């Protein structure tokens, strides 16, 4: 659509062109129209739809850029929009921004308080190495879930935060509840938690159980050898003392 004698075509004319391009599945031309609408009539619907079309074209850089612009203008007020933006940040390897967006959405009661969204916030903070922010989100995610997987993931976060007793308790709860994708990995976390608590016998049992799965057999054996060497080291230290 062309501007004539410096006059701006009416918004509905652009929308008619947009509709016709969509009807023909000419999405490149539809994007051109949407980008023009964004310049002259910067409404939420145009920002969001253009972002969606860039997503369809696998251009996540422009998709995220438009979502960011819409977010900064306060246009994104739906749970699905904020969740989408958080995932885009994660895909762009920007977990801190993902955590910030979803956390604010939850705090402002714009994002639905369901397990999956708390998990998204917790995972984003964990990836950003913000363990203290991740823990309460993962706690809420696990509490709202019927399966044990999220309790195991919570155990991982507790372990990262040096909360070893809570890590062991959470992993045990997850294994008991069931639905854990990799029980062997969960038992490795359990073993590491017990090791850091100085409960070597429990740690050894956990690693042996983990090693029953060939995918964790190597790490299990390494940990068991390490426990044995640590026990021997402590015995030698006691000898030196007395």
Report residues per predicted region.
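Alpha-solenoid helical repeat scaffolds
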Residues: 1-197, 202-234, 240-242
């Amino acid at each position: 659509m062309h501007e004539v004698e410096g006059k701006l075509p009416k918004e509905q004319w652009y929308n008619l062109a947009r509709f016709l391009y969509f009807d023909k599945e000419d999405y490149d031309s539809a994007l051109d129209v949407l980008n023009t609408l964004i310049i002259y009539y910067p409404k939420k619907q145009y920002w969001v739809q253009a972002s969606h079309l860039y997503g369809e074209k696998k251009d996540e850089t422009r998709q995220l850029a438009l979502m960011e612009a819409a977010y900064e203008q306060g246009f994104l007020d739906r749970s699905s929009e904020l969740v989408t933006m958080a995932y885009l940040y994660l895909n762009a390897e920007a977990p801190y921004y993902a955590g910030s967006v979803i956390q604010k959405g939850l705090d402002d009661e714009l994002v639905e308080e369901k397990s999956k969204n708390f998990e998204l916030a917790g995972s984003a903070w964990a990836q950003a190495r913000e363990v203290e922010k991740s823990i309460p989100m993962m706690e809420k995610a696990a509490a709202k879930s019927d399966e044990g997987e999220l309790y195991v993931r919570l155990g991982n976060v507790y372990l990262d935060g040096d909360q070893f007793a809570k890590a062991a308790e959470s992993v045990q709860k997850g294994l008991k509840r069931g639905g854990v994708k990799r029980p062997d990995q969960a038992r490795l976390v359990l073993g590491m938690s017990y090791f850091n608590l100085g409960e070597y016998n429990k740690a050894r049992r956990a690693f042996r159980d983990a090693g029953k799965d060939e995918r964790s057999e190597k790490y299990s054996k390494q940990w068991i050898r390490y426990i044995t060497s640590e026990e021997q080291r402590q015995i030698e230290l006691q000898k030196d003392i007395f």
